[in-house]
Amino acid sequence: MKFRILPVMLAAAVFAAYPAHAQEAAAQAQAAPAPATPADQAANQPAEKGELSIIEENDSLFSDSDKHYTQGARASYLSAPLTAGWRYDAFDFLGPLFPSSADRQRRFDWIVLGQSIFTPMNLKLSPPSATDRPYAGWLYTGGELLQENGGNSLTGFEVLLGVVGPAALGRQVQNDWHQFIVGIPGGAGWDNQLKNEPAVALSYDKHWRLGIVELGGVGVDFVPEADVTAGNVFTYGAVGGIIRIGNSLDTDYGPPRIRPGPSGTDWVDPSRRSASFGYYFFAGGEGRAVAQNIFLDGNTFAHSRSVDKKPLVGDLTAGVAMSWKDEIRFDLGLLSRTKEFYGQQGQDSYAGFRFTFKL
């Protein structure tokens, strides 16, 4: 199995001071200290650590060759909860995008590095078939502000910045890895890949956690989601959701996946864990109305290869997620995607996994 993983990695605190007034007041304060404020209580708690996650998605489980969306890898760092202060308020300029509530919790998810690779079905042709999707790579970094309200709804705003084209190193990762590590030939048509182009993707998404039933420590819930993404990489609107069965369901909103795909999230609140060993099985899907996909439509500012994309695309997914205390999380999922362009031969399927650990 041909897995290519991109790794990398890195947290803060608050303080307060209260002026003394009169000698008598100071003596009373020593005799009967004032109740601790929420800020004092937070400062006295052990600092929660951030988490590093590695995601790998690959089609090798379902075929003996690469085709279409053949490889995705991403390293991300989820911060501890942001406390009151400039970092907490830095995203308030987004205003109504983030609902206001007294119990909101914010975290920042730094997308350290990500890469996606796309190829036609027949890797031996050079130039490749004009009716098959073009060779392309996407290399990016970015971040997402995640805010939870009421313990059961999550809002995210993500910015991804990078490059599409030879500078994304798709050719080197696919061909050099295959020949040096696995010993099989790579794609012969990379000279025809999309040209270099700055790549931007802005995404706004919502998740809701709807409990259905819980019995004997095992629960069932439904997590619907809606997502709008815009940019020269992707422009689409999506709705979907997953059903989960297991324990500690209120610690997260489902496993994350690389866009475009059923958009889970890195968000987790381990303080809600109900057992040392957490697990759940999940199944669901997502439907997308697609206005732009650079990997099918071709370059925005230059002539390049392209195919006629389909405006509606759907994904079905199923898998399992596991965690041990607050230290390690792992999930594995399988995904099947409907045809993305006219003339495509067969649907695509791939496997994805995530490994997360505290730093």
Feature names for model-found ranges:
Residues 98, 126-131, 186-192, 227, ...:
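Extracellular loop and loop/strand-boundary signature of outer-membrane beta-barrel proteins
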Residues 24-30, 35-85, 113, 118-122, ...:
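Short glycine/proline- and aromatic-enriched beta-strand/turn motifs that initiate or cap beta-hairpins
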Residues 121-124, 242, 247-359:
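Outer membrane beta-barrel transmembrane domains
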Residues 67-73, 135-139, 155, 196-202, ...:
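Residues that define the transmembrane beta-barrel architecture of outer-membrane proteins
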Residues 52-58, 109-117, 159-165, 206, ...:
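Transmembrane beta-barrel strands of outer-membrane/channel proteins
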Residues 93-171:
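Long, hydrophobic/aromatic-enriched structural stretches that serve as scaffold segments
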Residues 37-49, 81-107, 148-156, 209-222, ...:
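Short loop/turn motifs that connect adjacent beta-strands in outer-membrane beta-barrel proteins
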Residues 73-79, 113, 141-147, 161-163, ...:
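Residues on the lipid-exposed face of transmembrane beta-strands in outer-membrane beta-barrel proteins
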